Amino acid sequence: MSTLKDNKVGVNYVELEGVSLLTLLEGVSSHASTDKSLPTLNAVHIESEGGLFKAKATDRYRLIEGSLLSVDGRLEPSLIPLYDIKRVIALCKDHKANRVQFSRIGDTITVSSLGDAITFTVSDGTYPPTEQLFTDSEKEPTAIDSIAFNPAFMADYAKIAGKKAAIKIYFTGAGKPMRVRITGDTIKWRALLMPMSYKD
């Protein structure tokens, strides 16, 4: 006889702490493209396997991934439009002290907590591969004379890190992405930022 837990796993179900999920999605969604003509990038990619829930987003100029421990279940890779991610964030704000559940059946995901629920359809686009970019950024840092970047992006990192927290930047070469290290209590962050062209 199958157990309730077996049934949850069978239909793609994962459960997370509301406050941690809120922090994760607020941070990751800040890096999603706001260009609705790019539906694959105007979205957040999520998945959960082996007790680890991951979310990532990119606008082509920066890339971020955050991961946290899940309470229960698994969820196959799913691309969620930014509009719907904002709805999930709103639900999490109302349930920071509670657990939040994701349940996927087919192309439909329902996010719920204590009777409140929203349902939406996942995007059908193919998310760009990102793991190799993160792997390449882990190589030995290099010394460079100077680098230009968008300061507004750094402000987003400051919000993710929290008040009085430091972030650390690693340079991997001229014209290559900078690796941004953000330390979190419950979330493990990985972030990359492309330099800008600049003429003196």
Residue ranges and their predicted role:
Residues M1-D200:
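DNA polymerase processivity clamps
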